Amino acid sequence: MLKKISLGLILLATPSLAVEYQSPRTLGLGGAGRGGPLLNDSIYLNPSYASFTPTYSLTGGYLWFDKGRNYNLSVEDSRTEMFQAGMGYTKREQNSTLNLGASKTLISNLGIGVGAKYVIDNDTGSKTMNFSLSSSYIATPWAYVSVVVDNVLESADTQARNLYRTVYLGTKFLPLDKVTLYVDPLYSPNYKLGPKAGVAAGAEITVMSDFLLRLGRFQHGEISHLNTRGIGNGIGLGYLGPKVRFDYSFTRINSADGGYGLSTSNSLETTVFF
């Protein structure tokens, strides 16, 4: 009972955070992946990367945890030459969010992007809008680097809604043919609920060409469905077929800012792409 009450207080006290949706792939990687988001993940993690994945994709996701459920639908079209764009809608216990992302390549290995979020609180109906800026650079075939600044418009009002300006450095490394590593440090200069800096790191391992195993760890990293940050681990499985992708993740949260302790979550997602 105390555990559920504590979680409820966190959900009420922190109505919004930098990342409104984390896919099973992201959660399996411990919240990492900004250096190389796959398909519609770029809408939330790093809009500038959409320029490097020229597909049309539709995604539906579902996450369940101790105290509720999250639902997500998104669409992204990265096939056009002028610019690439996507839109996602997330329904959470505390609010509903519309995310938009658009990107453009400046040169073949350098992309820039802008994101927007529109958050509506379920209880009060109050609304908040903010933006993100991002850039992705493919330095070598085995090293990718991205910089993302989320919640660019920071003020006393946005801080009251837990929308702190946050800078992410997303990195992706391919040390082996079927192993990809992601490390995403973050820093929020004015974050008040815990340490200002954190990191998420994960590994994605290809098994039998179509199946993926993901392992991740976050240290003061973001926990989207709880609207806070914390410490924990993620594990995930994925299948990537010719036109469809299935993903699952399990996350164990050891502690979270705001006083909430141990909790778990499960997440499923399906994507079709052309």
Locate each region found by the language model:
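Generic N-terminal leader/processing signal
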Residues: M1-L2, A102
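Sec-dependent signal peptide recognition
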Residues: L2-G8
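Hydrophobic alpha-helical segments of integral membrane proteins
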Residues: I10-L12
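Sec/Tat signal peptide C-region and signal peptidase I cleavage site
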Residues: T14-A18
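Subset of outer-membrane beta-barrel
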Residues: V19-F274
